[in-house]
């Protein structure tokens, strides 16, 4: 049977339809996607963001279940313990060196550590800070090794005893209290200072004690007066009043007079050096009475 010829219009439509089907141009969405992939930021986001999102979703699904979380944390803690609890990392005791018995006892109270313990669980910096806060401690070194927590102390050395309202304090050369004593006889080898503000002028006080060393045991104390100057207190109730400025030079002159004229060996109660231009000496009551009772004095008075 002979096929029926299509009309020219139908043949034209059929050709256009076949042409459209073979059109190599991309679709609208494909075109937009290709344009976006030409953008570096979008391309990097797709390349990096997609794996991150997939991993995040997987983690969320796994950790969203309590039994999965417990299983993972159990294995994690076991792995950590297998490393940190090894014998070479364990500390079983502590040792304190360089500290006096009283200071060592105070440090022991700060070492609140449940031994044995892993070095990974030790907060050495916190322990070092707490020990360094103790006033007698000048420097501290804390380190763990060989199964022992080693605490090495550099203790402040007292150079004087400060008599204050709350008792007798031991002071170092920087004016920092290192401890307290009950009686002066507990540290007789240390010089005695007293008065408000004496601890702030300890370097000057130690220099004055050095200059007064020729007087030996006659030196009893240095008393700070008005937080600005010193009085040197000697036995026999003698006092050397020093100026607020250049007290060292003033005391040197007094010591020179003692060596040349035995000034402090006489019946002198007070040597006033506060006025640099004029030295004033006040005699004892006994010396004044003896002076008044002299025959020449009585005759002159009559």
From Swiss-Prot:
Which controlled-vocabulary keywords does the entry list? Cell cycle, Cell division, Cell inner membrane, Cell membrane, Membrane, Transmembrane, Transmembrane helix
- PANTHER family named among the record's database cross-references: CELL DIVISION PROTEIN FTSQ
What Gene3D superfamilies has UniProt attached to this entry?
Cell division protein FtsQ/DivIB
User: Membrane topology for this entry?
Assistant: Single-pass type II membrane protein
POTRA domain mapped to chain residues: 89-156
What does this chain do? Essential cell division protein.
Question: In terms of domain of life, where is this protein from?
Answer: Bacteria
Q: Which residues lie on this side of the membrane: Cytoplasmic?
A: 1-43
Q: What is its main location?
A: membrane
Tell me the GO BP annotations in alphabetical order. cell septum assembly; FtsZ-dependent cytokinesis
Q: Which residues cross the membrane?
A: 44-64
Question: Per its UniProt record, what InterPro entries does this chain match?
Answer: Cell_div_FtsQ/DivIB_C, FtsQ, FtsQ_C_sf, POTRA
Q: Would the keyword Transmembrane turn up in this protein's UniProt record?
A: yes
Q: Which Pfam families match?
A: FtsQ_DivIB_C (PF03799)
GO cellular component terms, alphabetically, are: cell division site; plasma membrane
Please indicate the ranges of residues that lie on the Periplasmic side: 65-302
Q: What is this protein called?
A: Cell division protein FtsQ
Enumerate the subcellular locations listed in this protein's record, separating them with semicolons: Cell inner membrane
Q: Which family does it belong to?
A: Belongs to the FtsQ/DivIB family. FtsQ subfamily.
